[in-house]
Amino acid sequence: MITPPFYCDYGSNIEVGKNFMTNYNCNILDVAKVTFGDNCMLGPNVAIYTAGHPLHPKTRNSGYEYGKPIVVGDNVWIGGNSVVCPGVHIGSNVVIGADSVVTKDIPDWSLAAGNPCKVIRLITEDDIRKLFRNEEIDDDVWKIIG
């Protein structure tokens, strides 16, 4: 499910798995391939950038642009206003906190956040019923989803 507006360079370089969901104002610069696994969720204003430009102004001003692919594993939630930079691989079962700038690979089962984005801790079975700030899913809801 894509909540408009949605922006991309080409669209032909974007591959999504089952149950993909992005909130409004997603921006994917797909000059290189972008791959999302199954059950990925993107918050509002998430930007996925495969495109880059040279550092030196003489080279940059020539119009040269390059692209590096981005891979996002299964069961990933990328929080609102986050940016994923060229060449990054985000593992499976990962949560990226809101307002993060992901410049390096993030391993499976990680909770990561910040600018630059860093792993805060691993996600474990102890987290199965946790919500925001260690609140737990109440029993009535757990009976339905658990």
Q: How does the language model describe each region?
A:
Residues 1:
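N-terminal active-site beta-alpha-beta segment that forms phosphate/nucleotide-binding
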Residues 4-16, 21-89, 115-116, 122-124, ...:
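Flexible, glycine/small-residue-enriched loop-and-beta-strand segment within the central core
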